[in-house]
């Protein structure tokens, strides 16, 4: 690995294959010149590589056999000594040691430089390490190192200072006036080396510490702290500063930079050879010039060229232009070898190509069992070759491997018999790229099939996200017994029924199967056999076989539990095919996709894994059979266009004409017009959609005997496909048979003119053109987003790769409180969904009897959830990864249930990686979502009222209101909230009331479901007068602060406030008494003055009398754009990366009363006044929408304007727990909007990693520095030590890091270097002499051993297995193996 040339990699065990397992840690540090000479087997003196006539390496050249070892095994260069018998002899003629040629991969050489050079990494990696240590600016340092300026080493009697950088001219001026002896200057790396050698680090450390404590300036403190960090790193690591300047350069082994002969007598060479040659040439020339005593200027130039050559070797292109090869391509330097996707880390250490693998196209295998896959015979023959050879020898068909090979090549009959024996019950792995989560690789038992395509079981397609339109999959063969056991026990498709992301079944029938099951379980009136009563299920089957009863007929059956059920014949057919032990209720319904998923989930919980697998296979078989028998197809006639479509469109068109007229007359603004038009069309589209659904979803059935009719659920094929969840949705049906509706522009704005036709009628050219606009954006997005999503996943994996379950219980006393998630009164996620699979922190008491129902540390399973719902618990405090006290990783109780297995998580589980995959995987799914709707604008009709969704009692919080002329209460301000609570006092729904809403209920009023609570104008924001009085205008100047518009039809004029340039005007309306004194508001102590923002329309005249509750002005609300995940994925990344949001909200840092204080510097000024303490003022930019009204009360952390708050602000004002909850909610919001379920705990694991560092505010007696970022665990440990010694402990404040930052500051430098910014990470690590204890997963993969998790968890690895002697007894296990599928359940 090419780190060696740059650093020593000192490992605490020799890197021998057996000892790699026992490796405890790896240390990296700067190589001293002595070290480099010690590694070297000789000095490379000549730039020659090989002799072009003899093809033998040149002596003392870059490929010299004397230094690096022989080219041929056990043969010296001149051919005097050959073969093993001379092993270890050094040939006296050519000086080559007789040894194996592989030493040419490990022996290093060196180059003795004629002049020292600076190591470019320590010079150019920002902040420059050499610069920081000498306290020099980067520019000055470069001038000195590249022989552009002098540096003063000893000022003597001059007025210059030591380490001052002077130009050639200044130097000559000084020399004229002064005797040269006492005055010393230097140039180049030599001078810098001298300065570094002189440094006394201990003294420097002490003086820096004192200075840092005494200084008041923050910038200076920062600078000193930075320098102090570097000084401390050198002292603690034992590295010397002068080692950053090199006298000797290591030469890496020749086999790692090979010279390969091509045909035609030319050679292909590694770029490193060119770079080394350049260094050697310049070095030799410099030596010669120095021996000849050449002029100073020539030597100086040569030294600069040597420095540049070494720079290019280490990091080409870091400084100046990159040195290019013969073809104009920049040469690949040592740094390029290790960094980036093609570098050593990511290309060869983290991702390797493996043998015993193959790939082919996949086709569906409808006859397979869930644990099987079809493997083409040709492929199997190639993959299992060694097994076949050995078996041929064993059975005596071949005596040598060579003859076995021939038999296999001839494909004799015996080969196929042996192949089928070898393959039987041998698990193989199937993988589909991109592998976005762990279900992208699963194990199956192969069945040999003819043809060349791999057959895949249809139910695992969802996990692989595979379809059969030409997808390919790769096959891998696990070789060792351990690998085979892991495949069977952990990776078998039958053991992966639940999704690790949310615990719901991932093996769920889809498409044809769903359609078949739906068709079987639908009922229809007046079918043959309706009303028959059967004594048992077998009787029904017999009746169906004898054609006495139709499968849709409504019948009654006595089931095994003795009850008589109303059901259909088809449902009994399904029931008969299922494994025993499941309740009949699970299938006694119309089996839509949702119901089937519930059935599979219930089966898993009730009957166990084996029964579920059998169930899934039976459902597949029944579903396919009946989908075929039903013969459901699509015809154009099935798309029924509603009769009322024309009327609805005509009504909408006339409404739009009205709105257009109002706009032309100036009654409404452009924004209002746009909003209203879009709203009209949205409503029309929804009306047509519901009309179409009504017509397509029901049909009238006639009894042939009695002529009686009944309305049934429709058997329209398109409706059945959509309703069952097999294919297609409401939106797509609407576009086919209703109207396509509004389309969106690429910017997300909605185009005002909708497409009124549907696909059955066909689109006009113009309509087609309108629809291409949004559709094209969908396609472009897909391409871009896939890459973005993959990058997000990579960052997530990197930040949590070392989060493993380390212990069972960390003993924490802290947790998080969880409630249901609501939005606009709707429950988006109820409490039971959020707490399922978590662990209780506190015991739960019965609200009435006060006895403990569930003790602390109870795992909340389905039973507990049901019980909690019954007794009506509204919020629960659970343990969480966020509050887990484990030093490394998390503990099992804080994590809770392993979602994919349904029991408490095992110790050693890689919960971090699972979390990253669960969040990253849907990202890619979501990216693909946009273009399926084909760019049609999905927009809700603007909401303009609240209706009660539950019965209960009204509770109003912070609601201020005034009564208007009609006796209706109008809400003032935006901080008011309305909730409905039930008898137990649990909150069932909660709404934020908008300013100016008409409130129809009172505090404490009992309401029933459906009661009208409040309504408002969705397009306008009203300004409501709070008192009776007379209007007085201030700063309303025509043409300057407002514009008058005349309405032609009504001859009424309206005044609209315009953007005014000067800040001296503050247009406002005040309400005065008869004497002209401004009156007080009712809701607060401030005067009744209303500032008018730009765009507000005034509804009153100056001097007019108004009453409380009158609307004196209104401001049209902003237009809404369509949301899709394209907004969503960047939003998720923005949150995880802790970036400043684009629409950043202003957050109040304190609690208090808000007052508007006019404007300053073109911004609006808000002042928040607390009860005690100083008020804080906030400047709000003009365009920003303010969320609070004058006189509102705000809490610390409340948003004063619209938009998203910055995460650092939340951390400062509300603390860590609130920030964590906010992050979880915001990220879930994005995924929930797309209908993707991810368990909270996955996001919590990632947020835990973002919050794992803290910033030191006061170091106390510790060695920390002010502003240093420290790991919480290390901080705690250090403080405990300090307290024991009786010194003052350090204090710190919480810190939130973005995932990239968190990955780069991880304790493992190997992991960080393989992530991003490789050179920077390695430079800083080597400077500190860092140790990597190999605790994470990536470090272990890189050093080539098993990951310390799962079966490779260290504590499991160290267990001794003792097998007690047993008496012979019949082996039940083997008998059971005969019944397939083989399933081994492992208990936690």
From Swiss-Prot:
Keyword annotations: DNA-directed RNA polymerase, Magnesium, Metal-binding, Nucleotidyltransferase, Transcription, Transferase, Zinc
SUPFAM superfamilies linked to this entry: beta and beta-prime subunits of DNA dependent RNA-polymerase
EC number: 2.7.7.6
Chain positions recorded as Zn(2+) 1 binding sites: 76, 78, 91, 94
GO biological process, one term: DNA-templated transcription
Names of required cofactors: Mg(2+); Zn(2+)
Superkingdom in the source lineage: Bacteria
Reaction equation(s) it catalyzes: RNA(n) + a ribonucleoside 5'-triphosphate = RNA(n+1) + diphosphate
Residues that bind Mg(2+): 467, 469, 471
Cofactor binding note of this UniProt entry: Binds 1 Mg(2+) ion per subunit.
Listed GO CC annotations: DNA-directed RNA polymerase complex
MF terms (GO), sorted A to Z: DNA binding; DNA-directed RNA polymerase activity; magnesium ion binding; zinc ion binding
UniProt: Zn(2+) 2 binding residues: 810, 884, 891, 894
Free-text function comment from the UniProt entry: DNA-dependent RNA polymerase catalyzes the transcription of DNA into RNA using the four ribonucleoside triphosphates as substrates.
Subunit structure: The RNAP catalytic core consists of 2 alpha, 1 beta, 1 beta' and 1 omega subunit. When a sigma factor is associated with the core the holoenzyme is formed, which can initiate transcription.
Family of the protein in this entry: Belongs to the RNA polymerase beta' chain family.
PANTHER family tied to this protein: DNA-DIRECTED RNA POLYMERASE, DNA-DIRECTED RNA POLYMERASE SUBUNIT BETA
Designated name of the protein: DNA-directed RNA polymerase subunit beta'
Species of the source: Lawsonia intracellularis (strain PHE/MN1-00)
